Amino acid sequence: MSARCIMVLGTTSGAGKSWLATALCRHYSNQGLKVAPFKAQNMSNNARVVAAPGGEGSEAGGFGAWGEIGSAQYFQALAARAVPDVRMNPLLLKPEADTHSQVVLLGQVSDALSQMPWRGRSEKVWPQIAAALDALRAENDVVVIEGAGSPAEINLHASDIVNMRVARHAQARCLLVTDIDRGGAFAHLYGTWALLPADERALIAGFVLNKFRGDEALLAPAPQMLQDKTGVPVVATIPMQWDHGLPEEDGVFDDRARASGAVHTRIAVVAYPRISNLDEFQPLKNVPGVRLSWARSPADVHGADWIILPGSKATAADLAWLRAQGLDAAIAAHAARGGRVLGVCGGLQMLGEALIDTVGVDGNGPGLGLLPLVTSFEATKTVRPTRQCFGAVQGAWRHLAGVAVQGYEIHHGQTAQHPAMAASGDVARELIPGLAWQNPGGNVLGLYLHGLFEDAAVLRALFGADAPTLDAVFEGLAAGIARHFEPGVLDALAVQ
């Protein structure tokens, strides 16, 4: 088997590559084809735990360990009805500062690559990237490949490992998508095409106009003029979708109000600079009566029923930022009034009394003091899926008692009771051994488990409601591209 490769390129970041790749995965899966997603390199602090080759108990060439990939490829794999694995995103860069990222190669952190200059690193990792793609091609009918940024970044072309080098290696049929809502869409499409070498232009099979608002007839005669200049047709005009139902790949989610009917629960998520795994809160946007918003100042948490401290790629630095904004006092006051506070992973660590770092992973410092816990950072990273059952949860979070939840862990920290405080009887109630605790008052909850709100049982327990399933989201995306692509284009792309 040698898969047909279909690649989604963009004229800019944010053009719509990720959601279109996801829609294509479900569309071709619905045609009865075996489909896998692929993105050579992703830069994101939104990651998921998936199968990785090797590890204790694995067969030769099999999967028995766990690793990380970008969340976008995880969701694309689910859309494709494929088992997510590290080959689908062989290189993941997790930013830790403006000029430094943790490098994850085939699911595992590589300290050597993390210290290596970017241009030198690209050539070193290309063989593993190509091998991962070739393996997926050998096992599937279709591989849907996502590019990154723009393929026409001419200053980066010589060291490219994520756009046209991948397209050439796979001889992929490429769709070039642009965000027409920003303006200048036809210039973006033509300029991107014109900056590519002739052999790479030949791989562009169609242009896609995304996020269109208005009367499509008003676009004429521009699509035909563009085709006359390039030989490439506009194969789809996709209407604006204010909420396609997928988590944002990077940055923060769109927090415009969408609660249907009366709002009964206002949830503020603290948006510190190195936030991670924010995609796990996407289901809350779709729960009836819930209003989800970002908090960057004390005013943003005023009137909130819940405050969530999400994961962080730099816990100590983000905690310092939080204090500089005055959010520490606002969160403490909210908790003192009995308001709910939830800390996930890095957020859990912040809620404790202290951060201790003897290995240079994150940093030392005092915590917020809302849970009598202390976190020690270790060089070894815990990466694994986890299924656990909440114990005797009390107070404001009592509806979680006895609920079994499927999630995942990605953390360097190990958290335990503060020894001195425990000796005096001030202890946190442990709800899941080594993973979840709450304060004696019952309104502050901290846990290492990501994915809490992606579990239907949790949503029912906390809100008495269900959010739309991911499968329904995938089907909606697939139906949308089937309507808006020109007839026959999607079938032709997948033909060998």
From Swiss-Prot:
Protein's recorded name: Cobyric acid synthase
Keyword Transit peptide: no
Domain GATase cobBQ-type: 264-458
Organism: Acidovorax ebreus (strain TPSY) (Diaphorobacter sp. (strain TPSY))
Annotated catalytic residues: C345, H450
Keywords assigned by UniProt, alphabetized: Cobalamin biosynthesis, Glutamine amidotransferase
Domain of life of the source: Bacteria
GO biological process: cobalamin biosynthetic process
Molecular functions (GO terms): ABC-type vitamin B12 transporter activity; catalytic activity
Function: Catalyzes amidations at positions B, D, E, and G on adenosylcobyrinic A,C-diamide. NH(2) groups are provided by glutamine, and one molecule of ATP is hydrogenolyzed for each amidation.
Pathway: Cofactor biosynthesis; adenosylcobalamin biosynthesis
InterPro entries given in the database record: Class_I_gatase-like, CobQ/CobB/MinD/ParA_Nub-bd_dom, CobQ_GATase1, CobQ_N, CobQ_synth, GATase_3, P-loop_NTPase
